[in-house]
């Protein structure tokens, strides 16, 4: 009787939804990102799960607010995920 799912070759979407410790290869859910300020266009590096309010170095506007998990970016801010 064949299995319905292949445990050694899960789909990428299925792997993303799993807990970080239960994936085939363990990997964290958090990352660093470059956030661009909508006012002065300066780029600040922010942790995705920041636990404090992050302010822009140039104009002191709020870039992101902490929530229970991931930090919520302020409207108008653009970000890009940093590479390893």
Curated annotation (Swiss-Prot):
<dbReference type="GO" id="GO:0006364">
    <property type="term" value="P:rRNA processing"/>
</dbReference>
<keyword id="KW-0687">Ribonucleoprotein</keyword>
<comment type="similarity">
    <text>Belongs to the eukaryotic ribosomal protein eS27 family.</text>
</comment>
<keyword id="KW-0689">Ribosomal protein</keyword>
<feature type="region of interest" description="Disordered">
    <location>
        <begin position="1"/>
        <end position="25"/>
    </location>
</feature>
<dbReference type="GO" id="GO:0042274">
    <property type="term" value="P:ribosomal small subunit biogenesis"/>
</dbReference>
<dbReference type="GO" id="GO:0005737">
    <property type="term" value="C:cytoplasm"/>
</dbReference>
<protein>
    <recommendedName>
        <fullName>Small ribosomal subunit protein eS27</fullName>
    </recommendedName>
</protein>
<keyword id="KW-0863">Zinc-finger</keyword>
<dbReference type="GO" id="GO:0005730">
    <property type="term" value="C:nucleolus"/>
</dbReference>
<feature type="modified residue" description="Phosphoserine">
    <location>
        <position position="11"/>
    </location>
</feature>
<dbReference type="InterPro" id="IPR011332">
    <property type="entry name" value="Ribosomal_zn-bd"/>
</dbReference>
<dbReference type="GO" id="GO:0003735">
    <property type="term" value="F:structural constituent of ribosome"/>
</dbReference>
<keyword id="KW-0539">Nucleus</keyword>
<comment type="subunit">
    <text>Component of the small ribosomal subunit. Part of the small subunit (SSU) processome, composed of more than 70 proteins and the RNA chaperone small nucleolar RNA (snoRNA) U3.</text>
</comment>
<comment type="function">
    <text>Component of the small ribosomal subunit. The ribosome is a large ribonucleoprotein complex responsible for the synthesis of proteins in the cell. Required for proper rRNA processing and maturation of 18S rRNAs. Part of the small subunit (SSU) processome, first precursor of the small eukaryotic ribosomal subunit.</text>
</comment>
<keyword id="KW-0862">Zinc</keyword>
<dbReference type="GO" id="GO:0006412">
    <property type="term" value="P:translation"/>
</dbReference>
<keyword id="KW-0479">Metal-binding</keyword>
<dbReference type="GO" id="GO:0008270">
    <property type="term" value="F:zinc ion binding"/>
</dbReference>
<feature type="compositionally biased region" description="Basic and acidic residues">
    <location>
        <begin position="1"/>
        <end position="16"/>
    </location>
</feature>
<dbReference type="InterPro" id="IPR000592">
    <property type="entry name" value="Ribosomal_eS27"/>
</dbReference>
<feature type="zinc finger region" description="C4-type">
    <location>
        <begin position="38"/>
        <end position="60"/>
    </location>
</feature>
<dbReference type="GO" id="GO:0005840">
    <property type="term" value="C:ribosome"/>
</dbReference>
<keyword id="KW-0597">Phosphoprotein</keyword>
<dbReference type="InterPro" id="IPR023407">
    <property type="entry name" value="Ribosomal_eS27_Zn-bd_dom_sf"/>
</dbReference>
<dbReference type="GO" id="GO:0032040">
    <property type="term" value="C:small-subunit processome"/>
</dbReference>
<dbReference type="Pfam" id="PF01667">
    <property type="entry name" value="Ribosomal_S27e"/>
</dbReference>
<keyword id="KW-0963">Cytoplasm</keyword>
């Amino acid at each position: 009787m064949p299995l319905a799912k292949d445990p050694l070759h899960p789909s990428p979407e299925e792997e993303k939804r799993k807990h970080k410790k239960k994936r085939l290869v363990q990997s964290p859910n958090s990352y660093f990102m470059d956030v661009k300020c909508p006012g002065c266009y300066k780029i600040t590096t922010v942790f995705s799960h920041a636990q404090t309010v992050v302010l822009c170095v140039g104009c002191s506007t709020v870039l992101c607010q902490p929530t229970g998990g991931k930090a919520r970016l302020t409207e108008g801010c653009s970000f890009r995920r940093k590479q390893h």
